[in-house]
Amino acid sequence: MSIVIINNFGQYNHRISRTLKYLNIENSLIPNTTSFEEIEQMNPKGIILGGGPSIERIGNCKEIILNMDIPILGICLGHQIIADVFGGETKSAEIESYAQIELNILKENGLFKGIGDSLKVWASHKDEVVTLPENFEILANSDKCDIEAMKHEDKNIYGIQFHPEVQHTPRGGEIFENFNKICENY
């Protein structure tokens, strides 16, 4: 079984796939217009919702989030889509972030297992989740964004605002390996 990456047409979506391949994690990168039924037939062990330019171009992401009963990781726009589906709120950031930032890990969890209390990550966004959805907890923040990472309290649904797939997040591969372990143990 592989991880399916939903391409929301962001500049880094192909890097997610390449990073997973480098880590020997089988994956498929598919457009966000792929139907839920087609994805279900692929029998994925997990879903990654990639970044993208606009909440108006998210294809079938909401249906995927609501109907797939497997681990999901949303990155950047994917994080914002998860928040939206579960009743959170996304707004334009007071300060757009296009830089390496210091991530503060607030709670030990499977996604950041073995990482420690802080991590250098790459931020590339003009919008951010400002209201945490009900039944979610904040896993990490930064001085640029209060909700850098979140997790559903009862489901293996994670959202991260930053980009683990780029070289400016030196330990991003560990985050993907941890997500893969979450998928394998589900």
Swiss-Prot record:
Reaction(s) catalysed by this chain's protein: XMP + L-glutamine + ATP + H2O = GMP + L-glutamate + AMP + diphosphate + 2 H(+)
Function: Catalyzes the synthesis of GMP from XMP.
EC number(s) reported in the record: 6.3.5.2
Catalytic center residues: C76 (nucleophile), H163, E165
Pathway(s) where this gene product acts: Purine metabolism; GMP biosynthesis; GMP from XMP (L-Gln route): step 1/1
Enzyme class: ligase
Subunit structure comment from the entry: Heterodimer composed of a glutamine amidotransferase subunit (A) and a GMP-binding subunit (B).
Record GO cellular component, one term: cytosol
Name used for this protein in its record: GMP synthase [glutamine-hydrolyzing] subunit A
Keyword line: ATP-binding, Glutamine amidotransferase, GMP biosynthesis, Ligase, Nucleotide-binding, Purine biosynthesis
Single GO molecular function: GMP synthase activity
InterPro entries: Class_I_gatase-like, GATASE, GMP_synth_GATase, GMP_synthase_A
